[in-house]
């Protein structure tokens, strides 16, 4: 099971950041997809915390928002796909068979480190491998025909959850990625909330994921990508 690195190891990992940032920045500068971005500040956590995971899910090492640092960011990335050759359940089934079909594998790849079978299932664990210090261990905590949800584990830069869903829509499919997370520690909070570097890396990763999901569907993206961010200041309870 993954463990949280010691603080000294986290700072040593920072020495590898330039390589990771260079790779992501090159792609980021040449994006042509239309982005609709909105960020607002919410006064309370009501409606902005992740769903509870089922009782049967092992909660060992799961990082809850109360375990994090700084504000909670509730983000939703969404796009509409026209002319999809796959229904919403079919598209999600295809994705669950291999998450790397949609991952921007130039700089991010899902590696399953625990679990069996030909497709994603509850209890499976992955590490999202990225250049620099961005590797993130996660566990599947929810799974149905049109969605799945991941919770961050000890050692991840964030404390929270992220859900991927495909929704049937008139004439196509709407694909959404919704996350509820705080920074995992003070260093992560500095990079995400204050310097905003990690925040832009994250945005580039998930918008690239949506582009590749669209290609996987055989359809075309219409209206670009909408990114809605709600910043919630808390309180969130005591750290574990």
Across the structure, where does each feature detected by a protein language model lie?
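Hydrophobic-ligand binding "helix-grip"
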Residues: 129-170
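Hydrophobic/basic alpha-helical segments enriched in Actinobacteria
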Residues: 107-110, 150, 208
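A conserved amphipathic terminal alpha-helix motif
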Residues: 187-233
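Hydrophobic ligand-binding cavity/cleft-lining segments
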Residues: 2-129, 236-239
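Conserved short hydrophobic interaction patches
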Residues: 94, 98, 102, 156, ...
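Beta-strand secondary-structure signal
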Residues: 76-78, 127, 149, 163-165, ...
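Short, flexible segments with low predicted structural confidence
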Residues: 62-67, 137-138, 177, 181
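Beta-strand/loop substructures that line and gate deep hydrophobic ligand-binding cavities in soluble
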Residues: 155-200
């Amino acid at each position: 099971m993954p463990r949280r690195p010691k603080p000294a190891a986290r700072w040593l990992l920072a020495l590898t950041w330039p390589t990771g940032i260079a790779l992501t920045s090159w792609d980021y500068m040449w994006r042509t997809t239309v982005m609709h971005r909105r960020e607002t500040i919410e006064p309370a956590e009501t409606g902005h915390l992740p769903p509870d995971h089922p009782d049967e899910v092992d909660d060992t090492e799961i990082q809850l928002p109360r375990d994090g640092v700084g504000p909670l960011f509730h983000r939703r990335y969404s796009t509409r796909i026209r002319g999809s050759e796959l229904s919403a359940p079919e598209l999600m089934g295809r994705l669950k068979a291999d998450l790397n079909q949609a991952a921007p594998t130039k700089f991010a790849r899902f590696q399953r480190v625990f679990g069996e079978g030909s497709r994603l299932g509850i209890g499976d664990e992955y590490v999202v491998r990225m250049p620099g210090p961005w590797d993130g261990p996660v566990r599947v905590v929810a799974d149905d025909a049109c969605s799945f949800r991941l919770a961050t584990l000890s050692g991840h830069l964030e404390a929270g959850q992220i859900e991927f869903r495909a929704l049937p829509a008139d004439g196509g499919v709407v694909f959404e990625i919704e996350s509820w997370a705080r920074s995992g520690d003070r260093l992560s909070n500095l990079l995400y909330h204050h310097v905003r570097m990690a925040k832009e890396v994250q945005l580039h990763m998930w918008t690239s994921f949506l582009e590749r999901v669209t290609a996987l569907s055989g359809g075309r993206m219409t209206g670009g990508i909408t990114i809605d961010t709600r910043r919630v200041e808390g309180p969130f309870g005591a750290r574990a």
